[in-house]
Amino acid sequence: MNLRLKRWITAGATLAMVATMGLSACSTNRALSSETGKNEVTMASRTPNWIFPISAKGYTQGENGQFIQSLYRPLFAYKSTSETPYKINLPKSLGQVPDVSEDGKTYTITLRDDAKWSDGTPVSTRDIEFWWNLVTNNKDQWASYKEGFFPDGASLAVLDEHTFSITTTDAFNPSWFIDNQINKVALLPQHAWDKTSADEAVSDLDRTPEGAQAVFAYLQGEAKDLSSYAKNPLWQTVNGPWKLSSFTPDQGLELVPNENYWGEDKPKIDKLIYKAFTGDDAEFNSVRSGAIDFGYIPAASYNQRSAVESKGYNVFLWPGNTITYLALNFAPQAPGSKFINQKYIRQAMQQLIDQPTLSEKIWSNTASPTCGPVPMPADKVGTTDGCVYKFDPDAAKKLLEDHGWKVVPDGSTTCENPGTGDNQCGEGIEAGDALSFKLGL
């Protein structure tokens, strides 16, 4: 049984808003923003706790990805409205559209020739090779790795300073492979990071398994030292639009423009401030006082939207691709496992979840019902049309009664027909057992 509610913003927020002044600063040039007397924007955000572009287990929160992409541009960025093959957003990508061989096994990619690191060093395929060597020799440390998937069954060939190819042993659907496998490739500044200590000279250590493991251990260790982020020279070598200027764990950070950024989407403000809050109430108090430029309205406070807009904020929904669900404990030692192991009970539980009412009353219509994590047809989005187990208390009651239960609304439902037959309660359930569960938060 899963409760799947589509939320409309990432990082646990429900609505986002930008102050009129802040929005102008983000969308106009610096001269115009200076006329408003505001050259910086403050936004509500959980403070990231990972900066190394190779993901690590336990550090894959959304705010980490957003933070890293502001400092390091990806091989491929995407845009749903892009007319480029594979929906690649070329202005924000370091790579051009891949050329796929006729047999579907070789992907040849050319890097932009104008991209460079913040110290002026050109971005090159050596940075691709550096990533490849670190990842393939430290697979067990990479959060995105799954045995049998990329880079397993694949090989890298560096063709020149700006061109490389990846060849697979099997042919895959190019759209899937480019958008879900090759997009994991990250360019890392080999000229600044290929070492095992702060005072060691950079060399080609990554080109041996032992060296790659030592370099990876060093970089990962530095990434775990959050208090050093802003002053560590490692993290000052970036190729994205921003550089880190200040970082206080659990409190916030400040970004300033990367003056050597090569892209067209250069920052239009002088400083971007991420401010962390202890909870929704503290954040929303800052919104109501006008203390931040970009934040969110918690779902429970959505009825205060008009008051927020009266402060000069522009309120808008921010679609988020996520679901909310109940995680069931199937462990044999769990108190309710003998019930959860019964498929018909899980089906009945799903039929007792009133997604439409939850979406309306709890989430203030900032969430919508769904059947599960697989996207629904466009004309069904936001409904339970086509869901196998819609909200249907009568059907849930009948399902339980058909399996030997005495259902008592608002009371204790007990097993009257124990056993493993089709019309019985199921294995491990005894006569008189009450159907109950413990919820953990």
Describe these PLM feature segments.
Residues 135-145, 155-158, 245-260, 273-337, ...:
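Extracellular/periplasmic solute-recognition and catalytic clefts
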Residues 22-25:
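C-terminal motif of bacterial Sec signal peptides marking the signal peptidase cleavage site
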Residues 37-48, 106-109, 131, 164-166, ...:
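Short, well-ordered beta-strand elements
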Residues 27-29:
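Bacterial signal peptide processing site
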Residues 340-441:
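Append "and occasionally in soluble cytosolic enzymes with long acidic Gly/Pro-rich linkers
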Residues 96-142, 159, 165-167, 283-286, ...:
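Aromatic- and charge-enriched surface segment that lines or borders ligand/interaction sites
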Residues 147-219:
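Surface-exposed binding/hinge segments that line
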Residues 44-102, 133, 237:
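N-terminal lobe/hinge region of extracytoplasmic solute-binding protein
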